[in-house]
């Protein structure tokens, strides 16, 4: 069995870890970084992921996709998506089934397809370290992700060529990372996870009995559209408003300027965690008839705090709900762990510390803890980590729509998973031969206020007065938190195998098509790498030849020089194209044409090695070297 890796698929950054010698180890990517920006750029030639995509974002804003996690498993008409449509430089569109998709380089793409590019980078990082192919992974998601978002994350894994062995909640993973080496007795920890795009709070009890550790999630809550990106957007809005006030120009209509503004806002926000004032200085941000315009704005930590005060307060509300759901008070919490890059902001730490009335743990790396926890869970699944039991919960209630557009819950939120539940329902009309079962997820009484997970029909019900037929609906949640639903007509005793036709998400056929597309791109990428290699070799050959021509000077006959220059021109023309064979052929021809030049260079080198009269003979071979002892003679005249 191959190794199972742990991946933190983040909104802003992603991270991969693996068990190495029994310890979870975060792996460095090809650029030498322990985290990879969750940014994907589409160019005419290739797909860039991570730092290389981030570097070119300013010049290619409409085809550079970031924070894709905010769209995964969401409908285009969702309020959260509509908020992003206006501020993202790339184009968010509605797919045929109503899902939120992205359009880049004229191609329409599903969020799982884009997320798969990040997962492929994580997979490659692990393969480079392990020296073997990786096909299995544990992937983390926000605890408050609904069924559609979890399904979409698993789809992303499949498209990337990974079998997702387990979907694990991010705060639970962080608690695993924190508690795995701490063998003391019972401990109740609160994990406050404020990442790039999502927020979670989980209350987790860590028990250690007879060497076995149990991590039991007591309650979880959160907001899947609250994170560092929202903090950045407040800063961007402030800077754009200040510029408009001063210059009368609205930068929001210029994608290039907005991308520069985004980078500057993020940088300023990070700086203000360690300093009390910073300056955003963007020369030539735009221009009008009077000439170029520059943006120079001083911003203090206090100003930033006032811009995001309501966002921080918003994160405290789920804390109250989670504590109430767990039937605990703040005094029952032993430790508070902060996870996610946005928790580095001093004001966030201050507010969370004040809420719980205690000091925060400083020994957890907010960027790496989740990936480490995922690697530990991977070790549990593979049998490498023993005596660890993880009991997670479903974050939201699950049920079906019943008469009067009411949601009837079958499984309450914060129920330990995996779990099963069933309930018997009946018909609303006389002689009704079919019922539609509408599956919902959420906490509202009115069905329209909840997330629709899909619906299906149970047909062939025998004619009977209303209320007589007995229809049993069974819900089954697996360890990934993903729901399976079945319905049975108890009168006939015949269970019908019914699959929910999801109202959103990718069909199996679409996922398979995307897997094939990804495989085709893998071949394309390999060919592109080979092409670049050939180009580099050709460029190197031309550069070396030009240098040798200069050094040869008059020693190179004119007709030979002409022949070589013609061959060099052919190489330079071939390099501009995409024909690898043509590049290699022209490079070979240049090598052959340069044979006379090589002879001259070799003759010159040999001449330089020869020794003119009067010079000392070359040193003997090392075997003839005689060791001598020297005695230091002091100069008394010093």
UniProtKB/Swiss-Prot annotation:
Sample GO molecular function, one term: ATP-dependent protein folding chaperone
Name of the featured protein: Chaperone protein DnaK
Organism: Shewanella halifaxensis (strain HAW-EB4)
Sites bearing Phosphothreonine, chain numbering: 198
Sequence ranges of Basic and acidic residues compositional bias: 614-623
Family stated for the protein in its record: Belongs to the heat shock protein 70 family.
Domain of life of the native organism: Bacteria
UniProt keyword annotation of Methyltransferase present: no
Annotated spans, Disordered: 601-638
